[in-house]
Structure formats: structure tokens, C-alpha cells
Amino acid sequence: MKHLLLAAAAVLALATVPALASEATFERTLSVSGRVELSVSTGSGNIHITRGAGNQVHIWGKVKQSGFGKILIPAPSDERIRAIAANPPIEQTGNIVRIGGHHENLHNISIDYEIQAPEDAFLDAASGSGDVTVDGVGENAKISTGSGNIHATGLHGGFKLDTGSGNIYAEQAGQGDVKAQTGSGNVELRNLHGGLHGGTGSGNIKVAGTPSTDWKLETGSGNIDFTAGGAAFTLDASTGSGGIHTDMEMLTQGSTDHHHVSGKINGGGPTVRIETGSGDIRVH
């Protein structure tokens, strides 16, 4: 009976552990005088970046507990959360702005960021497990997250997107080579003009654009949809157990069957190689 009472007391004690420490916010505005080099990172928080004035970087942040549901990890104190909000991890050296990164007091704490920056800023944004959203900012952008989603529009020039298991959606403004990779999510890319390497372990891929150099699209078990418009390119498509469908006129090359098609479309051009292990391929 005594052991049962002790066990019940232990369960009650665990149940009454607060789920959240308090939250605290901060706001900063940094003045810049030229092309900004912007680096943003957070352990498990979200990052949201939008286009702002050309001469400043405006930062709003929310500091909060991370590691929810992990009873053995003590919650950070309200005092520590407030201390980080009072002195957030922001560094500026001229037009180089670094937000997040290493901070000795960030154990069990995450920070969500909402940032306004000049549209032509060089951008490097990374989250350990949160979502990253970018709207109208980023020259030669590099965006990554461990397990969150990436949603980026208005990216200038080439860009590189990488997530461990989330979905990727991106729209390009201008021309440049693109690389987009996810371990198990879906990939959707629009308005591409340049080279492309897009891949996912088991999700679907949907792409619209005009190849100016070779493209490669690959998934382990999903479907792939490519909208080419009036682009001229050479198609090399293969699937392990799905079908290949196109409504475009094509001058075939070599042998073709239900699982492999190769040929020139609109006279040929850069090679678009499309591969899936077990999904369908559509080109239109």
C-alpha cells in the first residue's frame, strides 16, 4: 500500500510540472548602408523573413522554452528567458548581420524570429527543427531546416534549399541555378530559369520552369510533374514501376517503353533527367 501511495505521488508530481516557462519578446532595428549579408539561425524556432526598407534590418523575436514534453529536462527559468530577450544573440559588423548562432545561455530555449530586410540581401537562414518562410528577400539564398518546412518566394538568382523531412515550396525571381533537397517531404518549385537538381527520398516533385542548363529530378517512390511550357529540352525519363505521360511532341531517341522515354522536345536542348523508383512521371 505504501509503495502504491509513493507511486501515485510521483505521478502527481510529474503531472504538475509546468508545461511552459514564460515567454519574452524583443525588438531591434539595425541601420545598414549597403548590400547586407544576413545570417539567421535558431535551434528549434521558426524564421520568417520579409522585404523591408533598403537601409535597415528590423528584428522581432520571441524567446521561449524548447524541448516540450521532456520531463527530465528542467524548464528554463523566467529570469533566464527575460535575460536573453534583454540581450538577444544579434551581432552587426558594418553590413554583416548575424542573428542567432552560438549563445552560452540558450540551453532548452528557442527563439522565433520575424525579420524585415532589404530584398537584395545575401541570405543564409537555418533552423534545427522549425519552419523557415521567406518572402521577397534573398540573393543566392541558402535555407535549411532539420525537420521543418521551407516556403520561399521572390528569391533572386540561384538558391539552395535543404530540409531533413519537411516540404519545400519555392518561387524564383530572376535566373540562377537551384538545388532543393528533402529527405521525405514534397518539393514544389515555380518560375525556374537556370539549372536544377531537385530530390526527395519518398515525396512528390512538381516543377515549372525553363531549363537553361541540365536538370535532374529524382524521388525514391513519389510522382514527378514537370510543366515546361514552350521550352526546348531533351527529356530522359525513367520509372521503376510507374508510367510516363506527356502531351508534348517529341522526337524519340533509342528504344522506349512504359518505364523509359528519351527524346528531343521543341528541337532539343539541355537534358532534363527525371527518375522515380515507383511513381508516375508527367511532362506537359
Feature annotation, model-predicted:
Residues A19-S127, T133-T145, H151-T163, Y169-Q181, ...:
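Acidic (Asp/Glu) and glycine-rich low-complexity loops/linkers
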Residues M1-A7:
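Positively charged n-region of N-terminal signal peptides that target proteins for export
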